[in-house]
């Protein structure tokens, strides 16, 4: 839903309504080509429920944004009428700028009059680019040098919480696995040269981390810097080799994935570089957190994602978009090993919290059976609630809001929320500022 779909009638009514305890948000959708098509997409179904816009079966619906970022701003809806003319809509960012008390003083002192997190739902049917997000210092540098490509100066740590079975590439495999990759995938040596490739066999587990990382950095940078023509030829030969080998043996999961990526991005360097990364499969309810400067690529599935409020992405493979190979290869940490999978911890019988090691955000997941209730205690910062399935009600001390799938609600600081399920199961997610941040003040 672009900005041209919103009627903005000024801030006066928003200022008058700034004291409301719960406000509905109208949210923004991104139609990237890797998104699921039409009604197959969870994002499409949420958009239809949230905005009333009909789903087009020919269009990919990739991301559902909830927040204040200028690349996809949410709007606050005021007015009780049923027609567009009866309502006033302003951006969530304008509203919190006019009413900083909604954020709480601790949040304003730390991040100013803005939401420090960005909340999303992703529906993925085709692999996203091999990418990483910059830390704060690099984000400031990139934004200063190329503000059209890097739209803000913020870092972007994030968490991805699986709603359906979810697959991703994330982080570099172990040193032992990298040695097996160089041995078993001769096409890598073709692209980087034997002098570089053989260096992986001259480092060992007991060597200093920096020595190991420097070798991995060298090989990976050489690989990602290969010429397009050479890459296309080598990736094609690798595909043909793997297809031939299927007649004699069962391919590994990674090899099968690489063949699938080759169908999606024929001749792309990201196809062969996938061998360097951990192949992660998340079950619903499991989560993956991604720090700055860690390589990753989502492969398929639906997830809820939360991050620091940024849209900065450095890409280098599996994409038709701009690639910044030099920046990506120089920024990565080259930390080796399988990433930590978060399963969350229970707050109540119905609520699970996911608490990554970042100040800006945490995510709660609530599965509430019919007739059951739970309480989200008041916190010193703002929250955004998303109903992803079912229906129920949210209550404060003075108001009640009936909610259904696709409803997104902004709750100001210091408001306790009581939730009751009114369907077989109501599934909702809450994003808020990390409770660790408030505990350390």
Curated annotation (Swiss-Prot):
UniProt xrefs under Pfam families: PMI_typeI_C, PMI_typeI_cat, PMI_typeI_hel
Notes on activation and inhibition: Inhibited by EDTA, Zn(2+), Cd(2+), DTT, p-chloromercuribenzoate and L-ascorbic acid (AsA).
Known tissue expression: Not expressed in any organs under light (at protein level).
Cofactor binding, note field: Binds 1 zinc ion per subunit.
pH profile of the protein: Optimum pH is 7.5.
Listed cofactors: Zn(2+)
EC number: 5.3.1.8
Domain of life where this protein originates: Eukaryota
Thermal dependence, as annotated: Optimum temperature is 48 degrees Celsius.
Enzyme class: isomerase
Pathway the protein acts in: Nucleotide-sugar biosynthesis; GDP-alpha-D-mannose biosynthesis; alpha-D-mannose 1-phosphate from D-fructose 6-phosphate: step 1/2
UniProt key word Transmembrane: no
GO BP, sorted A to Z: GDP-mannose biosynthetic process; L-ascorbic acid biosynthetic process; response to absence of light; response to cadmium ion; response to DDT; response to L-ascorbic acid; response to sucrose; response to zinc ion
Keywords recorded for this protein, A-Z: Isomerase, Metal-binding, Zinc
Induction record: By sugar starvation, by dark and by 3-O-methyl-Glc (3-OMG). Down-regulated by sugars. Up-regulated by DCMU, an exogenous photosynthesis inhibitor.
PANTHER family named in the record: MANNOSE-6-PHOSPHATE ISOMERASE (PTHR10309:SF0)
Protein task: Involved in the synthesis of the GDP-mannose and dolichol-phosphate-mannose required for a number of critical mannosyl transfer reactions.
NCBIfam families: manA (TIGR00218)
Family to which this protein belongs: Belongs to the mannose-6-phosphate isomerase type 1 family.
Stated name of the protein: Mannose-6-phosphate isomerase 2
Protein's organism: Arabidopsis thaliana (Mouse-ear cress)
Biological classification of the source: Eukaryota, Viridiplantae, Streptophyta, Embryophyta, Tracheophyta
